[in-house]
């Protein structure tokens, strides 16, 4: 997603520090949630944008199916998708919904709405990698 060092891994979680001080409570950090322990990136690994962090799973909390969550923090505070700086994932810009789990991604003419059911129809696959992002295709408004 962005260049930075992996500073923590745990039950379904990977935390990446983006400012290089090794402390994910200062500056920018990215949290990846529901990451499988199988082939998960190790603490101390420096990632570049596009590097694989691990595999989607149900680890790290209650889940009805394999999926991933991404979040960002600045100085230890959660930053919303639409808060100031856009959150862009492989060309898809994230937007807040009216409540939790109701956001959407937008990339040109494509609009992808969050779907709590998450199934085959709720994914984006980057052809150049094994990484998958889950979505439900919906017509653009």
Enumerate the language-model features and the residues they cover.
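Conserved beta-strand/loop element in small beta-rich adapter and peptidoglycan-binding domains
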Residues: 1-3, 47-48, 52
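Generic serine detector
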Residues: 17, 29, 36-37, 57, ...
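Acidic, glycine-rich catalytic/binding loops that coordinate metals and/or anionic ligands
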Residues: 42-48, 71-141
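Short, surface-exposed secondary-structure boundary micro-motifs
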Residues: 52, 57-58
């Amino acid at each position: 997603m962005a260049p930075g060092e992996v500073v923590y891994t745990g039950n379904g979680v990977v935390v990446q520090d983006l400012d290089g001080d090794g402390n994910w409570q200062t500056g920018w950090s990215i949290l990846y949630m529901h990451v499988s322990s199988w082939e998960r990136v190790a603490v101390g690994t420096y990632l570049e944008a596009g590097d694989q962090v691990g595999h989607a799973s149900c680890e790290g909390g209650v889940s009805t199916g394999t999926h991933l969550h991404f979040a960002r923090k600045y100085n230890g505070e959660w930053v919303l998708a639409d808060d100031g700086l856009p959150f862009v994932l492989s060309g898809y810009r994230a937007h807040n919904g009216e409540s939790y789990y109701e956001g959407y991604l937008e990339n040109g003419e494509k609009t992808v709405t969050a779907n709590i059911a998450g199934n085959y129809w709720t994914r984006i696959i980057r052809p150049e990698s094994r990484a998958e992002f889950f979505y439900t295709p919906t017509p653009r408004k």
